[in-house]
Amino acid sequence: TDLLLWGTTTPNAGVETSVSRHFTMALNGAYNAWKFGNDMKLNLYLIQPELRYWPCRKFEGHFLGVHGHYAYYNVGQIPFFSGMEDIIYRGDLYGGGITYGYHWVLGDRFSIEAVIGGGYARMEYDKYRCAGCGERMGHYKRNYFGPTRAGVSLIYFIR
């Protein structure tokens, strides 16, 4: 589970399995359906598959990965983000990128992992003035290049 996503109140989990001597396949997902006061929204679901290459031993030390991602989001009216106090964004995000990570073994069953990645995301979304009035301001499409993945995960091995 990714502790950084939990910091945004987003429950998440992932699974990873060996596919060959130096490769593993991971699948991470997140879902946030919390409702906050004053029509504040931070709703999303996310899926992120990743193929990882481990130069030495799997599940130990450095790794490189190639990831894809898809998310549906409905976020807005967040008072502590400038420009989002009265706006809601609802749409899809998809793309992919590359990942670097490091895996620390803590014992027979537990590990900690840190990852960072960069790549591309395509966003297609509708912008609304407020949740209550439902006034759509327009439909937008954006291309993004930059950080696409960051995480610190607590891992439990099932053998």
State each model region's role.
Residues 1, 15, 27-29, 49, ...:
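Membrane-embedded beta-strand positions of outer-membrane beta-barrel proteins
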Residues 11-26, 45-55, 152-153:
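Feature captures outer-membrane beta-barrel proteins of Gram-negative bacteria and organelles
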Residues 22-25, 59, 108-112:
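Repeated loop/turn-to-beta-strand initiation elements of outer-membrane beta-barrel proteins
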Residues 30-44, 72-94, 123-143:
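Flexible, solvent-exposed loop segments that connect beta-strands
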Residues 40-77:
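Mid-chain, structured segments of secreted extracytoplasmic proteins
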Residues 144-159:
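Outer-membrane beta-barrel "beta-signal"
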